[in-house]
Structures are given as structure tokens and as C-alpha cells.
Amino acid sequence: MKASILTKLEMLVERYEEVQHLLGDPGVIGDQDKFRALSKEYSQLEEVTKCFTAYKQAQEDLVAAEEMAKEDDAEMREMAQEEIKAAKVAIEDLAAELQILLLPKDPNDDRNCFLEIRAGAGGDEAGIFAGDLFRMYSKFAEKRGWRIEVMSANEAEHGGYKEMIAKVNGDGAYGFLKFESGGHRVQRVPATESQGRVHTSACTVAIMPEIPEAEIPEIKASDLKIDTFRSSGAGGQHVNTTDSAIRITHLPTGTVVECQDERSQHKNKAKAMAVLAARIVQAEEAKRAAEVSDTRRNLLGSGDRSDRIRTYNYPQGRVSDHRINLTIYRLSEVMEGDLQSLIDPVIQEHQADQLAALAENN
């Protein structure tokens, strides 16, 4: 491992010990905001420290085994060779793990996020599939102990949604779900299809991190057009007799957000503004990222309809991720929320891309 990386790791261990000491300070314990921030930093540093400690131990084990290999006793030398082999494997594995732990962290990864699903091409079947996707993400959230809160839902006439927005509350929600942004295509025989023909439909998914209040950009009141209307259910059926639903248009960007889930106009407006802020910030970040990495592939989907990331083929029971050429034949498990087998390989590929970028820059 390079000397510069070892120096950085030693500095992180020093900081870990410093934070550990600070967490026992009565002054810090009395300041809840500071205590919370340091506790979070401590848990992040702990993983690196433990891994680096194991790496140094493996290095010591290798030196000891190499000394043992110089012994006159043949049995001891044979044992030493086995220990040398094991120590070298451990050093290689731990060095790779440390490199990943040292990769730049996305500050948004630990945050809650907004999940937006829109039915695309495919008529009624696209709306039904949007409902299936929401159920899939809800099941995944449940498995991770996260909470999902529907912000706005425009139900489709034959089930599912024309579009819907939900907030996912949970540690690391954005970090796990951010690679879900993009076009999701389904191939299956619709329930209404009498000839048994396979139809192709599509939905788009967009994942946006929740923006903390302190980081929300200033949005001028003059830049907003706010409309109120009566919230309605599927098929236009009114479910509220007051104009509590809110539609906010951000005039400079043309971004439109609707929220009609709450009976209170004030609550709907607050929810819509939170989603609007997330969309504006994400659009700015996506623009910056595109300018920086025109040539580098980006596994983070844009949420654009043309940006197809995954196909769900029901007749074959398969799911394919087109970004990394991954196909698994576990469709029913995936639709029940077992998304880890799809998410983990994309995260690993993303980390490999980051490592390659670092190698190019060094």
C-alpha cells in the first residue's frame, strides 16, 4: 500500500481516538447537536479503524511467519509457509477493503429521500406496473426498517398510479436507492389481454435526497406560481370538498410539483415545497456532474424516460440491469422487495469506477 494512503489512515485513527475522547466530555454530552454529529463521525471512523487495525495485524503476522520459515525444523517451516500464504491473502483483501472505505463519500448517502414513480408508455398496464414498483420499494424499505410516507398520488383508473411521490425515511435511504433512478421496462401478459400476447410497458423512477432546511436554496416567492384545487381519487372522483390540494410551479425551471395527500392545504404546501427544493438541487447537481464527467460513464440514472436501466421479464422470470449487463432469474423475489441482489452489484461497479478514476488522477 502507498505511503500516502498509510499516512492518511494513521491520521484517521488519530481522529477516531480524539472523537472517542470527546464523546466522553460532559460539555459535548450536554450539546445534543454536537454529540449527534460526533457520534455519526465516530461510527464512520470506526469501520476504517477496525479494518486498518486488522491490516496491520496481518502485516505483523506475515513478518512473524517469514521469521518462522527460517527455522531448522521442517515441520515448523511447512507451518510457516501456510501462515505466510494466509497472511498475504488477508493483507490483499484488507487493502482492497480499505481502498473502498477511503473513497469519497456522497454527503447525501445517509439522508432520507424522495421516490418518484411515473407511468410511461403502455397505457393502463404502465399504471399497474407503477403500482407494482411502489409495492416492491415499500417491501424493500420494510426489510431495512425504513418508513415510507406517500406525499402525493395520482391513481390510475385501472389500478396503480399515473404518478406518485413518496418520502423514504431511514438511515442510508438515498445511498441505497439512488441507483434506481431511470427507466424501468416490464414485459408481461396484461390481465386484460385475451390473446395471451406479451406487452411492453415502461415507468420512470427518480430518487432525490431530502435537503436539510439549512441547505435549501433561497426560492423567491415571485418565482413560484401556486394553484389550489380539490384533491381527487382515481377516475376524477373527489375525495375532498375543500381546495386543499396544491400545485406549485417553479417558473425559472418549469418544475411542477403537486401534493394532495393531506386534508390541510398548509401541510400539502409544506410537502410540495420540500419536493420542489429536492428537485431543484438535484437538477443543479446533475448539471454540474455532467460538465465534470462528460466522458465517464455514470451509473446514476437521470430519471429520464430514455435512460432505460432495467427490464422485468415475467414470462422468463428474469430481471436485467442494462448498465452492468447483469441478469438474474429471481423476478418474484425481486418484486417482493429482495432488491439487494440488484443494488449491491451496481454499488460495487460504481466503487470500481471510482477507484479507476482515482488511479488515473494519481
Swiss-Prot record:
Keywords: Cytoplasm, Methylation, Protein biosynthesis. One of its GO terms (cellular component) is cytoplasm. InterPro entries: PCRF, Pep_chain_release_fac_I, Pep_chain_release_fac_I_sf, Prokaryotic/Mito_RF, RF-1. The keyword Ribonucleoprotein does not apply. Pfam families: PCRF (PF03462), RF-1 (PF00472). The modification N5-methylglutamine is found at residue 237. GO terms for molecular function: translation release factor activity, codon specific. SUPFAM superfamilies: Release factor (SSF75620). The keyword Protein biosynthesis applies. Its main location: cytoplasm. It comes from the Bacteria. Methylated by PrmC. Methylation increases the termination efficiency of RF1. It is found in: Cytoplasm. Peptide chain release factor 1 directs the termination of translation in response to the peptide chain termination codons UAG and UAA. HAMAP family: Rel_fac_1 (MF_00093). Belongs to the prokaryotic/mitochondrial release factor family. This is Peptide chain release factor 1. It comes from Vibrio vulnificus (strain YJ016).
